[in-house]
Structures are given as structure tokens and as C-alpha cells.
């Protein structure tokens, strides 16, 4: 079983290396969009601009929404390899528990999956496609009104 694992690991590494080589070989051409690279390379100011636009559309909510600086972590869950500055929307529940707010947002359509930090719910925009911004606004307005 040990040698089978090494062979599978080598195969995975070889395929990954080929993908990266193909991507890097696109000199002068428009590189294909790779979502994770798009997420990692988005400038913080672009995230802030998106957050300001989203936040401006949420002023009617009874829940305070603010924009905060945060960190995104890359790598495997328990062993993050790097931290990248990011921007998050911070939602403070009013008249509702934090757990209930998170559960309602996760159960919505579309599901909004953020994380809890202290007594706030955060939605890190580095993990959201720009094309999803309006869907998030609509879902938050519908869910939290």
C-alpha cells in the first residue's frame, strides 16, 4: 500500500506540474482564468471597492454591516502556509444569536458561507467571485430584512 500511495502522489504532482507549466507558458497571450489564482491575486483595494459597493446597498438592514481588514489563509485547513491581506463584510446580529444568523445565511439560496470571529459574522470577499456580489446583496436583503 505504501508504494501505491507514492505512485499516486507522483502522478498528482506530475499533473499539477504540467498544468502550471502550461499556464506559465502563455507568455504574451491571455492566460486562462484559474479561479484560485484570481482569488489570490486580487488587490486589496479592489476588494475594498467591492465591499463599499455591497455595503452601500445594505444600508436598509436592521443589522449593522461594516467593512474590516482581515487575513485570508492559504494551504490546508489546519496547516495554513501563508496569510494574505483581505477585506471582509462584518455583520453584527441584532435581536438574534450569532449562531442563528450564520445558520440562516448558510441555509439560504444562495447559501452565504462566512465565518464567526468574536461576536461578529464575517464574509471574506477574497473568497467571493465579483459576479456573485449582487446575489449576496439580494440574499442579505431578503434574509435579514
Language-model-derived ranges and their functions:
Residues 48-131, 135-136:
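Conserved C-terminal alpha-helix-loop-beta "cap" of PLP-dependent enzymes
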Residues 8-58, 70-71, 80:
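Structural motif of enzymes handling amino- and sulfur-group chemistry
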